[in-house]
């Protein structure tokens, strides 16, 4: 962690704190001075104590540290999302080359997982079959992890498109079981809710309406006592869609209510997407 010392110094000076004020009861002043020059390492415990004394959250520190940001998973996901949404094959291949290099340098398994996601998406874009071996790597990793954290939730969410439906169904239930200890972390629960919504969409596309309805109910329970209005509205829409597929008029009301909520919140892009989804599947409101 010695490379973060100079950034700690910048934050300290920006907050008008002296070395003595920051170091008090955490580390010695000479040690802190040495650490801030990048000449010494520091324990994780002391590093977090310094951040706490500075009143800076780890997420804020990551955003402030340009060098660190280049290597974060958030940075990769941001670039991947942009490339995928724009069908930018050149950028996808560049990201793939970068992830191969990062993996060679660090042996961090996330860079291997990122390569798999990229290769599978490129296969999809170029009309090639998904690699079953690569799918197996993701599946086995997720199954052997005892407790899922944000990384595992996001990995699963970004792998849904190439995993077999049966695997996806099993893993979403695994995700719910293995993240219960992290329910108090709002962002993890929020991301999990989005993942559940994506699995529901996949089940509906496969015409597995009963399984989709079961997962909708599971998703609704997950969202109890939360303010995740987008996800709640999204589930309401697809509950309505399932009812429409079953020939029940109530489904039209549910879908219209969900779209009206999106319009009221000025989320016209999602409202248009949901309306187009109905049109594509033979339903008009």
Segment roles from a protein language model:
Residues 101-208:
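Mid-protein regulatory/catalytic core that forms ligand/cofactor-binding pockets
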Residues 89, 165, 209, 248-249:
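TPR-repeat structural position
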Residues 45-60:
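DNA major-groove recognition helix of helix-turn-helix/homeodomain DNA-binding modules
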Residues 16-33:
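Short alpha-helical DNA-recognition segment
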Residues 7, 78, 112-121, 154-158, ...:
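"A position-specific structural signal for the A-helix of alpha-solenoid helical repeats
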Residues 64-90, 260:
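Short, charged recognition helix plus adjacent turn
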């Amino acid at each position: 962690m010695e490379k973060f010392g100079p950034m700690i110094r910048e934050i300290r000076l920006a907050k008008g704190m002296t070395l003595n004020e920051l170091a008090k009861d955490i580390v010695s002043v000479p040690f802190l001075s040495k650490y801030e020059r990048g000449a010494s390492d520091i324990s994780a415990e002391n590093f977090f104590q310094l951040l706490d004394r500075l009143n800076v959250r780890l997420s804020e520190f990551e955003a402030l540290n340009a060098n660190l940001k280049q290597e974060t998973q958030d940075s990769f996901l941001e670039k991947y999302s942009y490339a995928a949404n724009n069908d930018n094959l050149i950028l996808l291949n560049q990201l793939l080359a970068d992830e191969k290099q990062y993996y060679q340098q660090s042996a961090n398994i996330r860079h291997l997982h990122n390569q798999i996601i990229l290769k599978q998406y490129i296969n999809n874009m170029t009309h090639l079959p998904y690699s079953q071996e690569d799918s197996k790597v993701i599946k086995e990793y997720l199954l052997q992890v005892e407790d899922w954290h944000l990384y595992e939730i996001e990995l699963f969410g970004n792998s849904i498109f190439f995993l077999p439906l049966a695997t996806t169904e099993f893993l979403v239930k695994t995700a719910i079981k293995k993240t219960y200890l992290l329910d108090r972390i709002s962002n993890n629960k929020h991301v999990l809710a989005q993942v559940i919504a994506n699995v529901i969409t996949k089940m509906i596309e496969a015409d597995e309406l009963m399984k989709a309805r079961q997962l909708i109910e599971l998703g609704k329970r997950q969202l109890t006592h939360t303010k995740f209005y987008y996800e709640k509205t999204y589930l309401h829409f697809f509950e309505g869609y399932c009812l429409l597929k079953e020939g029940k008029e109530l489904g039209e009301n549910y879908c219209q209510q969900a779209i009206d909520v999106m319009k009221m919140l000025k989320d016209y892009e999602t409202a248009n997407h949901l309306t187009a989804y109905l049109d594509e599947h033979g339903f008009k409101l």
